[in-house]
Amino acid sequence: MSTRASALAEKRLHGLSVQTVGRRVWFAKVTIGLAAMLTLAGCAGRATNFLIPTGQQFAGTSRIDILAATTRQSENTQPGELYSGERAIGLHFADIAVSIPPASARKAGDVQWPASGGGNPLTEFTTIAAEKVGKEQALDRFYARLRKTPHRNVLVFVHGYNTRFEEAVYRFAQVAHDAKAPAVPLLFTWPSRGRLLAYTYDRESANYSRDSLEAVLQFLVKDKSVNEVTILAHSMGNWVTMEALRQMSIRDKGIHGKIKNVMLAAPDIDVDVFRRQVASIGDKRPPFYLFVSQDDKALAFSTRVWGNTARVGSVDPEQEPYRTMFAKERIKVFDLTKEKSGDSLNHGKFANSPEVVQIIGGQIASGQTLTDSRAGLGDKLGLVVTGAAGVVGRAASIAVSAPVAIIDGRTREGLSDQFNELGGQVKQTVGGVVAPLQQ
């Protein structure tokens, strides 16, 4: 081999070596962030497969019926598990009746999670009924509930990353119950594996599901029985929502007026991408309400994963260029940064104020916007609208109770299981990082 050829070969090998080192450094940074989040979140276990029907409702408990449209794969291997985190072809449907403990036995705004396989209906959330249904059966039940709803409104909930099917159901049941919203609860649940280290899989599952969410929204706005639709999305669920709305707007030259409000809680979306999404949706759209917190540690981790690009849910709305962007796009922003949270990651602040859940949920679902003077929200919550961007500060907590956060005391998996998501090459690095953090 010539001297020149040897030099070129050495250069290529050096380049590959640098790339390999770079990947290892990236994995190490990500792993350190994950280990830190695991430490912050504590060591509590995580209940699973608790959608086992009791077949009865106990005195003093409340019943919430949840219709679910899902792109998850059907699961029949374990009792209490209707759908897995794998991807299905097309939309599937389920109907679940959730029992919520008496007010004297629970703190509103929280989910009283049962033990795996069941629970005590007097102190924990339990399942009265749970079954997979076909499209026609789902429609029959949807219309029956819509007829019983005074304003024929629908509340669509899109959960975030690291959320199992049963967790999404219980969290949405809590939202619907505590908000006391006169609307039919409709859950759109996409194939999240419910694992901390399945972040990239979940993101691709979100992309996989945007057409299906659009199909659900198209059905709602075109059906004459439906009066109004409110959308509530959290974390990565905002990505699915914004993509579906973007597609709808491009297809129909705007968003149908039946979609009254869109609430975006802690969006895990790149700021620049969000700006383009909003621009693509255009002016013919419903009001957007954005809930942010600059001390959101989960979104700080996401920022690092995505190359230090700011996430919409953690920006300072009073700073440029965000202030001007929100003003231009007429987006109302609720800044929750100064609010205390029982969530060590500050990613689930929305579950801390049940009173606000009730006020916001009730007013929006009944057809009034958050800035409607008839709603009296300013007096009730101490809201003050400041600046052209419509950034909202508050004295009381704002809450639109989110689904299971990126991770909390109940959402930890065994490390040996989760680290398989990143591959064996990072296990050694993780072991070296987690051990000292847990001491």
Locations of regions flagged by a protein language model:
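Bacterial N-terminal signal peptides that target proteins for export
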Residues: 5-31
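C-terminal motif of bacterial Sec signal peptides marking the signal peptidase cleavage site
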Residues: 39-42
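Lipolytic serine-hydrolase domain surface
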Residues: 44, 48-129, 140-149, 169-173, ...
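Alpha/beta-hydrolase fold active-site loops
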Residues: 153
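The conserved beta1-alpha1 loop
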Residues: 156-160, 266
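Short substrate-entry loop that stabilizes the transition state in hydrolases
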Residues: 164-168
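Gly/Ala-rich beta-loop-alpha elbow adjacent to hydrolase catalytic centers
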Residues: 233, 237, 241
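Long, low-complexity, intrinsically disordered segments
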Residues: 422-439
